[in-house]
């Protein structure tokens, strides 16, 4: 066989070996070569890429459209990452200038702009915003494959499983089920067992009172609706720079009738870190806080606990 033909054959074999295919919400995505310039449109993708040692070249870290920006725990880790708008308003122009070879989009948030994104670069639509912990674990593995870090991704998941197993040792057997909710100045939105935080808290050993409602993994309820549920344990995700609606509810007799309030089993965590990070790095912080807050132990949170 001629030397040039041998060289071409070898190159073809290398290219084939480097090709990778993953399933996503729009079908399957095949890359002819591993991604090196990734733009991430959700914080969970950023978290995962950083944990894998391959930070994105760009990410939607902005505050346009009312987004709160990068979660505090991620801020030190994304200083060199270009800002490509916000999750709600990604900048196609800024992304194009970065010449990405892969875009990671949220299946729920970015469905309308998926065609434009896929014209810029190969785009994987993953279930992040409305995903469970299992969905996010599958996401970690898919991202690992796309960037050539599958072994590292599998190790992350193995370490995570071991960490969750250790956390479950602290969980009190027979503890009553909880209701978990994101609280803003205007609303309280419960997170069911199908949401990320709702399923995570079950994975560390407590029982979520609320299953998925139809196709809703999270939905808004009133104080009256919360009292109708009357959970014995209440987990609230709030922001330190906001006054949550529950602050006003605390003067309402209905709030005082809640079993969780009467038992002293109301736990508060930073919603930016807990409900927006949704990646391997965030999970380590979350596990530590479920123990430090005494949530797992079904004991009153210590006065010194601060999220």
Language model segments and positions:
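N-terminal signal peptide c-region/cleavage motif recognized by signal peptidases
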Residues: 14-18
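Proline-aspartate-enriched helix->loop->beta-strand connector
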Residues: 92-105, 122, 226, 230-235
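Extracytoplasmic ligand-binding site segments that recognize negatively charged/polar headgroups
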Residues: 64-68, 112, 126-143, 175-198, ...
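Ligand-binding cleft/hinge of the Venus flytrap
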Residues: 55-56, 71-77, 145, 190-213
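A short, structured surface patch at a secondary-structure boundary
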Residues: 43-94
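Structured C-terminal subdomain patch of bacterial secreted/periplasmic proteins
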Residues: 233-307
């Amino acid at each position: 066989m001629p030397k040039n033909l041998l060289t071409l054959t070898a190159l073809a074999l290398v290219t084939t070996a480097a090709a990778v295919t993953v399933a996503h919400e729009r079908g399957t995505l095949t890359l002819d070569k591993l991604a090196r310039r990734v733009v991430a449109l959700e914080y969970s993708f950023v978290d995962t890429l950083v944990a894998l040692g391959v930070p994105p070249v760009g990410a939607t870290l902005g505050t346009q459209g009312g987004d709160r920006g990068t979660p505090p725990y991620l801020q030190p880790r994304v200083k060199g990452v270009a800002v490509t708008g916000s999750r709600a308003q990604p900048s196609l122009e800024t992304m194009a200038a970065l010449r990405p070879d892969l875009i990671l989009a949220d299946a729920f948030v970015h469905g309308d702009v998926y065609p434009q994104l896929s014209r810029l670069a190969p785009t994987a639509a993953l279930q992040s915003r409305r995903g469970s912990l299992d969905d996010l674990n599958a996401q970690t593995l898919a991202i690992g494959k796309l960037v050539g870090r599958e072994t590292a991704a599998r190790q992350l998941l193995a370490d995570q499983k071991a960490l969750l197993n250790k956390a479950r040792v602290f969980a009190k057997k027979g503890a009553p089920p909880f209701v978990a909710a994101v609280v803003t100045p205007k609303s309280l939105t419960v997170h069911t067992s199908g949401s990320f935080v709702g399923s995570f808290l079950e994975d560390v050993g407590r029982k979520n009172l609320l299953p998925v409602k139809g196709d809703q993994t999270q939905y808004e309820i009133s104080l009256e609706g919360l009292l109708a549920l009357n959970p014995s344990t209440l987990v609230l995700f709030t922001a330190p720079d906001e006054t949550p609606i529950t602050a006003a509810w605390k003067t309402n007799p209905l709030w005082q009738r809640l079993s969780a309030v009467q038992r002293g089993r109301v736990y508060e965590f930073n919603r930016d870190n807990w409900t927006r990070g949704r990646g391997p790095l965030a999970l380590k912080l979350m596990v530590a806080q479920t123990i430090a807050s005494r949530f797992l132990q079904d004991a009153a949170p210590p006065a010194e606990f601060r999220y």
